[in-house]
Design a protein with these regions (language model features):
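Short beta-alpha connecting loops at secondary-structure transitions
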Residues: 101-105, 169-179, 212-217, 255-260, ...
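Generic secondary-structure signature for well-ordered alpha-helical cores
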Residues: 78, 121-125, 150-155, 189-201, ...
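Extended, hydrophobic alpha-helical segments in both membrane/secreted and soluble proteins
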Residues: 141, 230, 253-279, 295-310, ...
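Flexible glycine/proline-rich, aromatic-decorated loop/lid segments
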Residues: 243-247, 285-299, 307-336, 343-368, ...
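Catalytic alpha/beta active-site cores
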Residues: 1-258, 263-264, 282, 289-296, ...
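Poly-acidic low-complexity segments
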Residues: 76, 124, 155, 166, ...
């Protein structure tokens, strides 16, 4: 009996040579590290070294998160990934009324350069690669990181890492936007230009499908809407006067890995192929690095369950295997208790150990793209590609990613997909172990990590002290220069850096830009 994939595509019970009738491996595959990059972006992939193990972490105060980062480094992590709390993500200071009850909850609270200095204290920034999951205020956190590097004596051209900086997906799936799309895209173009000359090894954006998938997007929707956002960013940069080959090599992507390994592997391969073709044919990119879809993967948090949470260890191992077989460049494996609370030290260590077992105790790193030529994988790759391209065409027909957002297209498609999954789970058609089958009569008690509510008062005290200690006229002058740049066409990152160096807060900098650019009001198109 034919089954349906997560994207609603048929999965046949048996595949054979006839499944690939007329299929041209030279056209569809190529060699690893060569166009169209179906088999991976590098010739040797993991045969020389494994993917980067980058565990997402951050909670409470900068000092608490700093201790967690040092522990992760001691346990063998290869890169840091910073989680920020909601006030920081929304451009509010910890003592703002809108921040009440959220300070330090889902990530670390960063209000100023003072906090950033503590966050990376004792961590040499020329020895570690850092990813920061921050979007609307991404420029601020990047500049504070650069300032901390300067204090450590690290030249900016030695800083490596990534800022997420993908605001379009915030309008679609997540909601941590600040400014309307037009100034948001202008800010992203300013970041591209700034990093090209100032921080050349920095990945300036991580175009993200993960959050759409967590909101309910199917694999085909995930890559279609993510690549459509990527096209919008490339068009914005080109319209701002940049040559595509000057910035495209620093673009990166971020996807989810579900437990459905076959379709996930097909999804990753299809995404690489589509992006390479778009960059070559639509934008005329000539640098091979401009054609490469490099991506980070995080295992699917939405598939983790609060019931029998230890079973999540198994889910995460399966998800991580799919990401590796699909050719990810870096990977975060979720902790088993994340459906309940922030990870404990033990659960975070087990999540990292899961990757280490995959890398060092299996043979998946022995050969490049082990599924190449598989009847089922190649057929599913073609099917996912066709479904994604169809969705991308529909986005283009609505005026591109921004036009489709204004019509509510992506959000509507994702909500329909999420509703289907919820219906199937409620009916029992979709089995979730421990939730609608194989339940326990009584759940075993589990003590989660709890964030101290006193953190909010501590951050407020730090802010009050900062405001009395700093040179207020210097802050005011820097914020005035920032607003002038925002009103005109000058790159806003230079005056923004001056303001942050003078100890202006995240809230103050974002409020200065709010005065000029306004704030985004969501569409009620559907």
């Amino acid at each position: 009996m034919t089954r349906e994939s997560e994207s609603g595509l048929p999965i046949e019970p048996v595949y054979g040579p006839e499944s690939l009738d007329g299929w041209d491996p030279a056209e569809k595959l190529g060699a690893p590290g060569a166009y169209p990059f179906t088999r991976g972006v590098y010739p040797s992939m993991y045969t020389g070294r494994p993917w980067t193990m980058r565990q997402y972490a951050g909670f409470g105060t900068a000092a608490e998160s700093n201790a967690r980062y040092k522990q992760l480094i001691a346990n063998g992590t290869m890169g840091l990934s910073v989680a920020f709390d909601l006030p920081t993500q929304m451009g509010h200071d910890s003592d703002a009324s809108l921040a009440h009850g959220e300070v330090g909850k889902v990530g670390v609270a960063i209000d100023s350069i003072d906090d950033m200095r503590v966050l990376f204290g004792g961590i040499p920034l020329d020895k570690v690669s850092t990813s920061m999951t921050i979007n609307a205020p991404a420029a601020l956190l990047l500049l504070m990181y650069q300032l901390v590097g300067e204090e450590q004596g690290v030249p900016a051209d030695r800083l490596t890492g990534t800022i997420q900086n993908d605001v379009l997906k915030e309008y679609i799936a997540r909601g941590t936007y600040i400014f309307p799309p037009k100034p948001s895209l202008r800010l992203i173009a300013d970041i591209f230009k700034y990093c090209r000359t100032e921080i050349p090894k920095w990945n300036t954006i991580s175009i993200s499908g993960y959050h759409m998938a967590e909101a309910g997007a199917s694999p085909a929707q995930e890559i279609a809407f993510t690549l459509a956002d990527g096209i919008e960013y490339v068009r914005t940069a080109v319209a701002a006067g940049m040559d595509v080959d000057d910035f495209a090599p620093r673009l990166s992507f971020f996807f989810v890995a579900r437990t459905t390994i076959l379709e996930e592997v097909a999804k990753f391969r299809a995404a690489r192929r589509i992006w390479a073709r778009v960059m070559r044919e639509e934008f005329g990119a000539k640098n091979p690095k401009s054609l490469m879809l490099r991506f980070h993967t995080q295992t699917a948090g939405v598939q983790l369950t609060a019931q029998q949470p230890e079973v999540n260890l198994v889910r995460v191992a399966v998800q991580g295997l799919g990401a590796v077989l699909g050719g990810t460049q870096s990977l975060h494996t979720n902790s088993f208790d994340e459906a309940i609370a922030l990870p404990t030290d033990k659960s975070a260590r087990l999540a990292l150990r899961t990757q280490q077992v995959l890398a060092y105790e299996t043979d998946v790193t022995a050969t490049v793209d082990p599924f190449a030529g598989s009847y089922v994988i190649e057929s599913m790759t073609d099917d996912v590609e066709a479904a994604a391209v169809d969705l991308m065409t529909r986005v283009e027909d609505l005026g591109g990613a921004v036009g489709a957002i204004e019509h509510g297209f992506q959000k509507g498609e994702i909500e329909r997909s999420a509703y289907r999954v919820a219906q199937e789970t409620d009916s029992g058609e979709r089995v979730v172990v421990g939730v609608n089958r194989f339940q326990l009569d009584a759940e075993e008690p589990y003590e989660p990590l709890r964030v101290d509510p006193a953190i909010e008062a501590q951050q407020a005290e730090r802010l009050a002290r900062l405001r009395t200690e700093r040179d207020q006229p210097a802050v005011d002058a820097a914020l005035a220069a920032l607003k002038k740049a925002a009103e005109g066409t000058d790159n806003v990152l230079h005056p923004m850096k001056d303001a942050l160096r003078a100890r202006a807060t995240v809230g103050e900098v974002c409020n200065a830009l709010r005065e000029i650019w306004g704030t985004y009001v969501p569409s009620d198109a559907f």
